[in-house]
Regions:
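Flexible, D/E/H-enriched segments
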Residues: 1-16, 26-115
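Active-site neighborhood of phospho(di)ester-bond hydrolases with catalytic His/Asp-centered motifs
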Residues: 18-20
Length: 115
């Protein structure tokens, strides 16, 4: 509902939408990578419902999943048609401590033609 409301308000305007969320929190690296991969798979598939379902089913985690899903829904309603995952890493990739990591990902949502 929030995503569609955003789209309705923003229709006809030139906007950039931003959603920010950490991914997995304080899991071992291997578990975090699996959880993060599922959320990022849903993002890459432009599947906001999948982002929400991933956590409900224990297959993924994003603390800001609601904001992420809302922005994906808004972007779809505004005509975006492509998502590209740019990067994924964990805090363990930086610190070397793989026992408890936090996952991070970056993606862009694009519209292939300007209206």
């Amino acid at each position: 509902a929030l995503g569609l409301a955003l789209a309705q308000i923003l229709q006809g305007r030139s906007v950039i939408l931003v959603a920010s969320t950490d991914l997995s929190h304080f899991y071992p690296q291997a578990v975090a990578e699996k959880l993060d991969a599922e959320v990022l798979r849903c993002v890459a598939a432009f599947d906001p419902q999948g982002v929400l379902a991933a956590e409900e089913q224990g297959e993924g985690f994003a603390c800001g999943r609601g904001a992420l899903a809302a922005v994906l829904w808004a972007a779809q309603a505004l005509g975006a048609d492509t998502v590209k995952v740019l990067h994924h890493a964990t805090s363990g990739d930086v610190t070397g401590d793989l026992t408890q990591v936090v996952g991070y990902g970056a993606a862009v949502v694009l519209r292939s033609q300007i209206r």
